[in-house]
Each structure stands twice: as C-alpha cells, then as structure tokens.
Design a protein with these regions (language model features):
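Active-site proximal helix/loop that lines the substrate pocket
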Residues: 19-25, 72-78, 107, 127, ...
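Activation loop
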Residues: 19, 27, 83-86, 90, ...
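C-terminal substrate-binding subdomain of Rossmann-fold SDR/epimerase-dehydratase oxidoreductases
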Residues: 92-195
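N-terminal Rossmann-like NAD(P)+-binding domain of SDR-like oxidoreductases, especially those catalyzing
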Residues: 1-73, 188
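Residues at the N-terminus of a long alpha-helix
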Residues: 38, 80, 111-114
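Hydrophobic alpha-helix immediately C-terminal to the catalytic Tyr-X-X-X-Lys motif of short-chain
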Residues: 49, 53, 57, 90, ...
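Structural element of the ATP-grasp superfamily
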Residues: 2, 54, 90, 182-183
Length: 195
C-alpha cells in the first residue's frame, strides 16, 4: 500500500488528485469542501473512497495528506474522451466540421479550470505545511454549455450545428466549486479565464 510505504519512510506530504465528481448533484453552490459528497457516478464514488483512506491515515498516523478536488480541467493535448472533456470534444468536432451534441438543455454549468492553473496549485501546495486536508482547485465560476457554444462560435467564426438530446442519467446539472480555502491556506488563485 502506497500510504503505508509513505508512513514508514516518513514522507512529509502526500498529495492526491480527486475530483468535483465527489459532490454529485448537490443543490447548493458554490460547493465547499465541508459538504458531504453524494457521488452520482462510480468515478466520483471511487475518488470519495480514496479521500476517506487519506483522512484515516492522517488521523491515525499523522501523515500529512492533501486531496485536491479538481474542477473541470481543460488545456492543450487533452483527450476528447469521457465526460470531462467537453471543451476538447467540441473543439475537435468544430475543426472537423461536424455538429455538436448537447445532452440536456445546455444550461448545465461547470467550473472550468485551465491545466496550467492546476499545475500552479500543486506547486504552491508542495511542502507547504499549512496545506492539509481537502481543497477545491477551481475558478469559482460556473459556465453553461450554451455559453461555451457561443464562445466557440465567436472564436471559430462559424455557425456550426448543435443538436440537443435528452440529458443522461447521472449527469450533474450545476457545478461551481468554492476556491476560498485554497486561497486562504496556500495562496492559490486561478488566473486563466475561458476568454
């Protein structure tokens, strides 16, 4: 077990990437670290379970564990598979001249954070003893899928087709993560906007 090995060799800090998926579809926004997770996907449940292991190791053995709940990360060379890559999926389809498919009415929101901001959060946290426990790594800004489409139309200069289909079971309607705790404890503020 990695946590046992870290404890035995006295690792000073263990940082684990987690996900906004641990929250599920909670009605309160912004989502804060203190909220109890109600994952609506196996991915979110797996991340929440791993967070539980880290909490127990911190409490039982004093291992400084940090969980970063990443918002929807985007950036260069991102794969366009899976549910988290809507920006890269839309980008590829637009470049290929294909229509976009939106599940639901397009008013669902996500907190999109640029990959370089995520890297910056990790760097700021490493070795910082005041950084312990769970943190959201986010912009605290909700952007709807329809807003993304409007931005893609402006950038591409094309009026591509968009098809709306029924929302998928388990999809989260709104997600916006508070970044107050990360700013307070280790000075992290995302600087990149979708513009």
């Amino acid at each position: 077990n990695v946590l046992d090995a870290c404890r035995k060799v006295k690792v000073e800090q263990f940082l684990m990437p987690s996900s906004a998926a641990v929250y599920g579809d909670l009605a309160v926004l912004p989502l804060t670290e203190e909220l109890s997770g109600m994952p609506s996907s196996f991915y979110g449940l797996t991340k929440l379970t791993a967070e539980g292991y880290l909490r127990i190791y911190r409490e039982a053995f004093g291992l400084n564990t940090v969980c970063f709940r990443y918002a929807n990360v985007y950036g260069p060379r991102q794969g366009d598979g899976g549910e988290g890559g809507v920006i890269s999926i839309f980008n590829r389809l637009i470049v290929e001249g294909k229509p976009l498919t939106v599940y639901g009415d397009g008013e669902q929101t996500r907190d999109f954070i640029y990959v370089e901001d995520v890297v910056e959060a990790n760097i700021k946290a490493m070795g910082n003893t005041s950084c312990t426990g769970i943190y959201n790594v986010s912009t605290n800004t909700g952007t709807s899928v329809n807003e993304l489409i409007t931005r893609f139309r402006a950038i591409s200069g094309t009026d591509f087709m968009v098809y709306y289909e029924n929302e998928r079971i388990g999809d989260i309607k709104h997600s916006r993560l508070s970044n107050v705790k990360a700013e307070r404890d280790f000075g992290f503020i995302a600087t990149t906007t979708l513009e």
